[in-house]
Amino acid sequence: MKKNLFVSFAFAATLFVSAQQKNTLLDAAFWKTSPTVETVQTEIAKGNNPAEANANAFDITTLAINNDAPFATIKFLVEQPGNSITKLTHDNRIYLHWAAYRGNTDLVQYLIAKGSDVNFEDSHGTAPADFAASNGQSAPAMYDAFFKAGLNPTKKYANGANLFLFALASDKHLKATDYFSTKGMSLKDVDNDGNTAFSYAARSGNIALLKKLLEKGIKPTDNALLFAAQGSRRETNTLETYKYLVEEVKIKATAQNKAGQNVFHFLANKPNQTEIIKYFLGKGVDVNKADKEGNTPVMIAAGARETAILELFLPSVKNINTQNLKGESALTFAVRNGSPDAVNLLLAKGADVNVKDKDGNNLGVYLVQSYRPAGREKASTDPFDA
């Protein structure tokens, strides 16, 4: 009976989400065609609401911005009823966040001229300018628009980093560095943890850039290895990058940050990392290392979509039933993220099916949480492609 009820609920939820997606303006494929204002008006005339959002709070204007729609089309959408420069979208971001993220200088200037708040922070505490910088945007013209609107060029953001440090990873030829140096920033800037420009540049895995920084006297820190492991939003670094940092720059392969994380904490849920994982296993990096929240690389790997890394970790696991500060085990991670293969691997290793978290929740609760209606899976893996 319970099973039938759950299936019925899942079916109803799927139908609901499907119904929500009938608005053609919410179809990502529509925006791949660079539609004109006239094309959008035609769809609106058919009854498609230009202010609607999908299940992940990406509204139509956000989709248009993230798919680099024509400026006139985006401007038209911003001015439609239900849309505004203060409208909150995914992660409580306003349109200025997305315009800056895409490096759309014309749109940034337009939104600022309409009164968009250059200091507005999303749910992660990120403002439009640092959101852009940390996602690879380094064009001076766009930052000029922010500075002219009153944004302090030397403002400190997350962990005491400035825009220059965030943008450095994408500044292959250090051209933006010259620009930011005229705004009170320099290659000698560090964040609150002493991370240098070298560490921030390591995120890109650009060895040529890293060598340029060394030539300029910028010292590396152990955290550079962890920055490299984090990579960028859509790209991961190569084995060559890690070998350069460990074997030439002489950063310890077992380096940890202040949160107690090693490279495995960042690599364990990324795809196509098998050779890199094997390299660091050979260097003695600990798969059982718990960070300050009690999370281990094994737990993170158990929650990944692929099981290749988990399989590499399992022979080195000391206690498969280790729990983090919330009382979650590797099996909890696997169940919550809906990975039957990972669950089977952990059970074969002796994982306890009766595990409960600190709130007394058993695996059944996490199984319910693992349910994702059809149509939401893609957005949950890479929402910016929505």
Residue ranges of model-derived segments:
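Ankyrin repeat domain, specifically the short helix-to-loop turn at the C-terminus of the second helix
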Residues: Q41-N49, K75-S84, Q109-D117, D144-P153, ...
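Solenoidal tandem-repeat scaffolds enriched in leucines and small polar residues
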Residues: G136-N257, N262-H265, K270-Q273
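Long, mid-chain structured domain cores
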Residues: H90-S134, S138-G150, F164
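Ankyrin-repeat boundary/"N-cap" motif
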Residues: Q21-W31, E52-I65, K87-H97, E121-A133, ...
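Ankyrin repeat A-helix N-terminal signature
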Residues: T33-P35, L63-P70, W98-N104, F131-A139, ...
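Sec-dependent signal peptide cleavage junction
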Residues: S18-A45
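Bacterial Sec-dependent N-terminal signal peptides
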Residues: M1-L25
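Eukaryotic tandem repeat interaction scaffolds
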Residues: T238-A386
